[in-house]
Amino acid sequence: GHDCVMDPWYSLGSADMLEVASMGLHVAQMTGVEQMQACFHAITEVPAAILGLEGYGLEKGCNADLVILQAADPVEALRLKANRLFVIRRGKIIAQSEPLQSNLDLPGRPKSENFLKQS
């Protein structure tokens, strides 16, 4: 396993499992959509199932522990190492970030871009 925590054994850690998954996808050359979705699943739902956590998931009666990402889907979350808009624990927002937006100054181009897929 890999927890990506900055400690004496791994000084480059950021505690960011999206970063770990992205690195793994690149190293293993897992660029197929199904492979990327499986990798996202491996850092989200699979660990809770392996640990036998109860009250985990998006169903009535669950703990409501979740992270809302600025991404349209799992592949985009991995591609962009998506911004965390909200971190929710037991139904309470414990961290919040503004959506990322890049301002541009290029003639004939939009004034801003968020690099998300357009629907």
List the predicted regions and their residue ranges.
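His/Asp/Glu-enriched, well-ordered alpha-helical/loop segment
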Residues: 1-69
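Active-site microenvironment of metallo-dependent hydrolases
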Residues: 40-119
